[in-house]
A protein has these predicted regions:
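Phosphate-binding site recognition
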Residues: 1-141
Length: 141
């Protein structure tokens, strides 16, 4: 049960119910309930949900991403070699989804954006070049 978060929950649901794709960044101090807010608001609506690994290497982060894809029902042919390939796999999962609206939740992004990982570059390419164009895609952080 969410207490004192009605306004934030309403804003998230407004983004979800919109007719266009939305990129929502939720940020704030650690341990204040951001992840809980997202999970309670979107309970069974996630097309994909992933949390970065604290102190994980690039290879460990990519392996975790593959594991999250598989948990969402995508059969990954291999662990992606880089973030561009990882986001291509996410695109395929989204294409395969029969849900009318897709919610992608990426938690702990700073842990994935390690030096020289190019995570943000791949995320920008995914969002600007593909995800923002559709009306059935939502991404939450």
């Amino acid at each position: 049960m969410l207490i004192g978060r009605k306004k934030q929950q309403a804003e998230l649901l407004e983004a979800y119910n919109s007719d266009d794709s939305r990129f929502v960044a939720l940020y704030g101090r650690r341990r204040v309930g951001k992840t809980y807010l997202i999970k309670q608001t979107f309970k069974d609506k996630f097309t994909f949900s992933h949390s970065g690994l604290a102190n994980g290497s690039l290879q460990e982060q990519l392996y975790g991403w593959r594991s999250s894809l598989e948990n969402a029902g995508y059969v990954a042919p291999s662990t992606p070699k880089h973030w561009l390939e990882a986001f291509d796999m996410l695109k395929e999962l989204i294409r395969q989804s029969s849900a009318k609206k897709k919610v992608v939740f990426i938690d702990e992004m700073p842990w994935m954006d390690t030096p020289r990982s190019k995570f943000v570059t791949a995320l920008e390419f995914f969002w600007n070049g593909w995800a923002s164009i559709g009306t059935d895609r939502k991404i939450k952080k």
